[in-house]
């Protein structure tokens, strides 16, 4: 039997184990920022870099007015429990408004699943926003 834990409930899904494609969206109203946590399966023969390349191709098709910085190696989590991931900055137009995003992605330890954190704001990120993002990345822990 597969059980699935969400923030509010545990669902009994019987014998069928679905792919976890869930999104969590957290809004920080006073900052006007949003943190989106997304999960997706990664094919067994693909690396994190290849999975990110696939994701970027999809994003580019959806938004022509988008700029991405090259992905850089980043550390997610605390000291001995950290994982290496990739981080990039993204700027895109949503309608007539610019959105600024910082994105970090990693493979979930022991699984062939990608976890993506996307921190965004409708306008430039302030130094305080960037510090907040770094704290979120630095304190990440896997369940």
Regions found by a protein language model. Give the residues of each.
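Loop/helix-junction capping segments adjacent to catalytic residues or to phosphate/diphosphate-binding pockets
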Residues: 45, 97, 126-127
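Surface-exposed amphipathic alpha-helical segments
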Residues: 8-18, 115-143
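Secretory pathway targeting signatures of secreted, lumenal, and periplasmic proteins
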Residues: 2-53
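Conserved short hydrophobic interaction patches
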Residues: 54, 58-62, 136-139, 143
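Glycine-rich, often proline-containing surface loops adjacent to acidic residues and nearby aromatics
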Residues: 31-36, 84-85, 112-118
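Signature of long, low-cysteine stretches enriched in small and polar/charged residues
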Residues: 56-107
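Short glycine/proline-enriched loop/turn "hinge" motifs that connect secondary-structure elements
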Residues: 27-29, 106-111
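Short coil/turn motifs at secondary-structure junctions
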Residues: 95, 110, 122-124
